[in-house]
Amino acid sequence: MRSLDAFAGQKLAALDAQSLRRRLSPTRRHDGAVVERDGKRMISFSCNDYLNLSQHHLVRAAAAEAALNYGAGAAASRLVTGDHPLLSDLEKRLAHLKGTEAACVFGSGYLANTGVIPTLVGPGDVILIDALAHACIWAGAQLSGAKVVKFAHNDPADLERLLLAERGAARHALVATDGVFSMDGDIAPLDALSELCQRHDAWLLSDDAHGVGVLAEGRGSGALFPTAKIPLQMGTLSKALGSYGGYLCGSQAVVDLLKTRARTLVYATGLPPASAAAALASLDLIAANPTMTEVPLAKARLFTRRLGLPEACSPIVPVVLGSAESALAASTELQNQGFLVVAIRPPTVPDGTARLRIAFSAAHEDADIIRLADAIAKLRETAS
């Protein structure tokens, strides 16, 4: 055991030396955007609860009622006894939202991608992935055993070059991207990617974790491109929908295959009833008031105007500072001023691009957004 502890200690020391060690910070959420850490209350700009629906009384009530009616957990894999009725209801609603034949719900977004990708491709196939795609896409690709190729971020020309080079020797080809990129907030050119996939007989997977609920009246980034054909539409329930879980929307045949072969569904306990009920309640609220989905982007654009940044196209706005040390220092100073803006460091983002990742929600007050923008402007002036 001493060798194991020594190994762990050496790894931690190396991370400390680069300001890359991460630590958990217990955080209590209060009403609106207020959080509490170590007895100090702050306005959080680091939460992905874009519509503040996790705090909505109807969403909370739905979760509580489901726990009382069905139990606290699913108690088994969905293929055993864990497929409670709420999951079928949720899958129908998600498929309707995304305009597909069917949907498959997983325990999380990470489990969705690490289950879907190895089910669809394997040795003899090729996966082409956007350079800045989420870690769970890369993890799923590595598990698949397929050849993995990276294309330049949001660059259809580079993707086409690689398709021309790789597609002929591969049995199947999968192109995978985020719809809204989680660390930069930009949107994939899904129309151009779709056209290339159709031309080269490749399958397009879009991870819309940060688009569903906040773009195109809640339908997500794919709906911004009416001509795009996206056969594999993945997303989460844990961000704008304020619950927990992940899903893949697609054809009935694809979903049927996932439900019998995706290892992260077959060998994992089903999503708890409370999580499914909360997501259903959130979908009800969005359907009843689709204009609510416009608020997070409007808040983000208030911030970018105030700070003189390019106009936001999603609720995520990065302020890139460069080194991990500078990002940590800026985050600490903002906490001193009453704002929780977590520093994002490598390997989550590329070396030299450590940043403040600012996430806007319907819970944010305009006055707080302006105060944050002004505080960051002063930090940038001091740094320069």
Swiss-Prot record:
Its EC number is 2.3.1.47. GO terms for molecular function: 8-amino-7-oxononanoate synthase activity; pyridoxal phosphate binding. Pathway: Cofactor biosynthesis; biotin biosynthesis. Pyridoxal 5'-phosphate binds at residues 109-110, 182, 207-210, 236-239. The modification N6-(pyridoxal phosphate)lysine is found at residue 239. Transmembrane segments: none annotated. Its cofactor is pyridoxal 5'-phosphate. It catalyses: 6-carboxyhexanoyl-[ACP] + L-alanine + H(+) = (8S)-8-amino-7-oxononanoate + holo-[ACP] + CO2. PROSITE patterns: AA_TRANSFER_CLASS_2. Homodimer. Catalyzes the decarboxylative condensation of pimeloyl-[acyl-carrier protein] and L-alanine to produce 8-amino-7-oxononanoate (AON), [acyl-carrier protein], and carbon dioxide. This is Putative 8-amino-7-oxononanoate synthase. The gene is bioF.
